[in-house]
Amino acid sequence: MGYIIKTDDSARLRLGIQSRLYEQSSVDLISRAGTLRGRKILEVGCGSGAMTLHLARAAGPQGTVTAIDNSPAQLDASRELVTENGFENVNFFEGDINCLDHLDNLYDLVYCRMVLHHVADADHAIREMVRSVCPDGYLLCEEPVIHDGSFCFPPSEAIDEFIRILRSCFSVNGRDYNIAFRMESVIRNLGLQIEHSRLHHPLLNSRQDKLLYAMSLSDLAPQMIKNGIVDPSSASELHEKLVHLSNSETTMTWARMHSVLARKSNGTERHYSKA
Ligand SMILES: C[S@@+](CC[C@H](N)C(=O)[O-])C[C@H]1O[C@@H](n2cnc3c(N)ncnc32)[C@H](O)[C@@H]1O
């Protein structure tokens, strides 16, 4: 089963807003993952490359970033961005997070943002990433929280309805929308030491930021309609309500990201042998 969200230009616009909202916190967490200059970094599900740039900068010219995604279109966008910005230390591969054993190296940092909730077996994906971390290296996973509907003040029925159908869509497609909160215990049970755990709630201040929910609905609507979760006219009615909400100056909305930075000590190996 493939990626259930569109990966075209409109989806990239939405990803651009999300990246901007989370960028500062993500860069701060990367800076906590030891000295990365001259080191090997693996980014899984690099998308259109927003974080690939920061990772390439952190590794420096003597270090390398291996960026993997299972979408050729996303890899093309990411490659273009990295080249435009003059980085020559990034290697791109088309590949699946569930199958990282073809990689020859172990990495000082394995980084993965907003990918695990798209994967059919997120626990297996985490095991694969843990196996790719070198002794004393780090794993940094960041996942958006779509656990409940509390993303708005005053409360909005449209946001609640959107979160309800979003969760249905992930469930019907066998995705774990609770992985943002589960991943910390999964990582700990694989023997890694949790060094930092953060729940970040950036506010969506401008009209364009507040459009995030309407944009997400547009990107997911074809899959939701295909799965019978919503009919086309209800989807377009809900879309209108979400656009309307983004125009309101008195409504506050926000997004959430849970991030876990974990370290693998030398004794970790016995816990994560392949299942
Ligand atoms: C929401 S985007 C996040 C992109 C990027 N990590 C960021 O934070 O901007 C999710 C990315 O994961 C990729 N992806 C989804 N399932 C994957 C899988 N099984 N293996 C590798 N990449 C996957 C998608 O193609 C998409 O580029």
Can you name each region flagged by the protein language model?
Residues 123-138:
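A short glycine-rich, Lys/Arg-flanked "PGG" loop and its adjoining helix->strand segment in the class I
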Residues 140-208, 223:
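Conserved catalytic/acceptor-binding region of the Class I
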Residues 42, 48-100:
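Class I SAM-dependent methyltransferase SAM/SAH-binding core
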Residues 20-40, 54:
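Conserved alpha-helix/loop element of class I SAM-dependent methyltransferases that forms part
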Residues 108-122:
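A short SAM/SAH-binding and catalytic strip from SAM-dependent methyltransferases
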Residues 178, 195-275:
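Conserved Class I S-adenosyl-L-methionine
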Residues 2-22:
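Class I SAM-dependent methyltransferase Rossmann-like catalytic core
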Residues 101-109:
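A short acidic, Gly/Pro-enriched loop at the edge of an enzyme's catalytic core
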